[in-house]
Amino acid sequence: MRDDERRAWVEVNLGALKMNAMMLARSAGVPLLPMVKSDAYGLGVAQVVGALESLTPWGYGVATVDEGAELRSLGVKRPILIFTPVLAQDYADIRAHGLTPTFGDEARIRAWQSSGGGDWHLAIDTGMSRAGAPWRLVERLRDVLSSAPPEGAFTHFHSADEENDSFDKQLKRFDVAVSQLPWRPRYLHAENSPALERQTRSRWDLARPGVGLYGVGRGLTIRGDEVLGMATTWPYLPVASLHGRIVDIRDLAEGETCSYGGTWVARGTRRIATVSAGYADGVRRSLSNRGVALVNGVRAAIAGVVTMDMTMLDVTGIDCQIGDVATFLGRQGNEELLIADVAASGGLSPYELLVGLRLRANRVYVDS
């Protein structure tokens, strides 16, 4: 038993990550700008970027100045874009680390230019209503954009994974906004992972995948060759799995309760296994009495409330012993718990479930 697999651990398959990135790049047909914010979605930015570097992405996307500075400390030389609005007090650190900010209002664009300028990208709001210049009002920025032209411009699709008309609306709005710029920036980018899944080639200069890199989504349609013209469906490879070890097994009689609040009550004699992984390790509390884990390839229901350090499973009829592995995300034998399915059972988004893996559990990296 490895020391980092004694209690609870997250296994990160860097080989699967690289394959997902390769397929995303092939599908998009343009260089990638991978999103590695929030410690690479909870999976470890140093190892994730180390794996992605072998695929020569155009650059990386982060959420904060500190995240960008961390990439520079890791030796990353490529462009690093900060996708959340920054304040004037951040400008010195941004320049010190060679980062690229994004702006969507005249005041900050002028402040950036007057304080020394440098590369920046224009954020255009086409419906997310979170940040960026409203698409209808981009024309009002023509004067400042002429004096401080952006290196790039982008938008963000809010519902590309939904079967409605919002994606097409945002596409048209982005096209309209770009047409109002004094001239076309060198780089246009918009597609997140769900947007890339909707089409077989990027419309712009860069593609900006996030969660698809990490194995979450419906997969890609890969273009066929020019002769046959056949397309291939490519499902993402799972990248992350979450495991703990059984540390206690006991039998409960009819009517006995399990965990805080006594919300789980034994109906007949039941066998309960306690696993050394709780919500401080990434087993979300919302999975209490709803989720499952895999024990020796068999699904075992979570019994009662997930606690900070331990989770109890109903293993009645399952052959298991202390020291066996319980899997909360990932595969055992012929059974697999996918991130999207586990998130749905706990009323979570897959993104929320992923970033929760950056908590206490050890990370174990494999390349297969």
Annotate each language-model stretch with its function:
Residues M1-A21, R26, P31, E67, ...:
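Active-site anion/phosphate-binding pocket segments in diverse small-molecule metabolic enzymes
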Residues R2-D4, A8-E11, G15-M19, G29-Q180, ...:
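Active-site-proximal beta-alpha core segment in soluble small-molecule metabolic enzymes
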